[in-house]
């Protein structure tokens, strides 16, 4: 069955973006927009689409959760042995995208990615809820085939016996954080009549950022 959505459209009229009034640092604007999304009760505003591409030149995308905005990029945590981890090992160029329909906004981040310090990953892992720590050990490897859900549940329950509530769960060597160092970041604000505002920050050789407006 085919479906036709060609007549479905909305008029975006909730905001505007002026190149003359934005801060020099894209991270300052990212923080401002993120805080506004939180205040407007956007559901999981820190959820972002992460696009990777390995040596096979086949792109893949999935949702991951932003956990930190640094002075040079953004940090998330995952399984290093996952499909995304394999892509990253072969090609460090990635893109991330936030889309907040409630605010009619997008943020597109392009950059290079690398593992963060293992001690920092371990510190974050130990802050996670106990069952989330245990669950991380079930995915060996993440995206690997499993016979059925019962096998997963049995592994999880056995791990909970091995590491009961209150016991320290070791940080897996295959699990940790990545930081995307931003080379370019685009802020998109929906406008009426498809005349959207698009401002892109580009990182220069000296580490500063220049800005320009893009056609919608």
UniProtKB/Swiss-Prot annotation:
Q: Which UniProt keywords apply?
A: Flavoprotein, FMN, Oxidoreductase, Pyridoxine biosynthesis
GO BP annotations of the record are: pyridoxine biosynthetic process
Quote the cofactor binding remark: Binds 1 FMN per subunit.
Broad enzyme group: oxidoreductase
Q: Which Pfam families match?
A: PNP_phzG_C (PF10590), PNPOx_N (PF01243)
Q: Which cofactor does it need?
A: FMN
Q: Which reaction does it catalyse?
A: pyridoxamine 5'-phosphate + O2 + H2O = pyridoxal 5'-phosphate + H2O2 + NH4(+); pyridoxine 5'-phosphate + O2 = pyridoxal 5'-phosphate + H2O2
Binding residue positions for substrate: 9-12, 67, 124, 128, 132, 194-196
Matches recorded under Gene3D superfamilies: Electron Transport, Fmn-binding Protein, Chain A
Q: What does this protein do?
A: Catalyzes the oxidation of either pyridoxine 5'-phosphate (PNP) or pyridoxamine 5'-phosphate (PMP) into pyridoxal 5'-phosphate (PLP).
The Swiss-Prot or TrEMBL record describes its family as follows: Belongs to the pyridoxamine 5'-phosphate oxidase family.
Subunit note:
Homodimer.
- What is this protein called in UniProt? Pyridoxine/pyridoxamine 5'-phosphate oxidase
Source organism per entry reads Psychrobacter cryohalolentis (strain ATCC BAA-1226 / DSM 17306 / VKM B-2378 / K5)
